[in-house]
Design a protein with these regions (language model features):
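Short S/T/G/P-rich N-terminal loop/turn motif that feeds into the first structured element of a domain
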Residues: 1-28, 39-43, 52-55, 76-86
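Short, structured coil segments at secondary-structure junctions
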Residues: 29, 64-67
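A short linear hydrophobic-aromatic micro-motif
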Residues: 30-37, 70
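Charge-rich, low-aromatic oligomerization/scaffolding segments with amphipathic character
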Residues: 57-62
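Conserved short beta-strand edge segments in small beta-sheet-based binding/regulatory domains
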Residues: 66-79
Length: 86
């Protein structure tokens, strides 16, 4: 399954609201959200999501009323001295 990073604006959300938003994404059953990171001060959230394609992922975020700044499909992932191709 293709892997995507996405960036979102979260301005004015409290830490509690951000936490609830992230929990909701991570426990979703219709899309596999691998990871969420957020900065309350920066007003931004990043997600790492497995999705069949970008249009489906865009519609998924729209259905949840989550603003997307950008979505990027990942081709290469480097960690622990190894590069993996998707």
């Amino acid at each position: 399954m293709p892997l995507y990073f996405s960036a979102h604006t979260t301005a004015c959300l409290t830490k509690q609201a951000l936490r609830e938003l992230m929990k909701g994404l991570l426990t979703a059953t219709d899309m596999k959200v691998r990871r969420c990171v957020a900065s309350q001060l920066g007003g931004r959230m990043l997600t790492e999501v497995e999705a069949p394609n970008q249009p489906t992922l865009e519609k998924w975020f729209i259905a949840r009323r989550i603003n997307c700044e950008w979505i990027m499909r990942l081709d290469l992932d480097g960690k622990d001295g190894t590069v993996t191709e998707y």
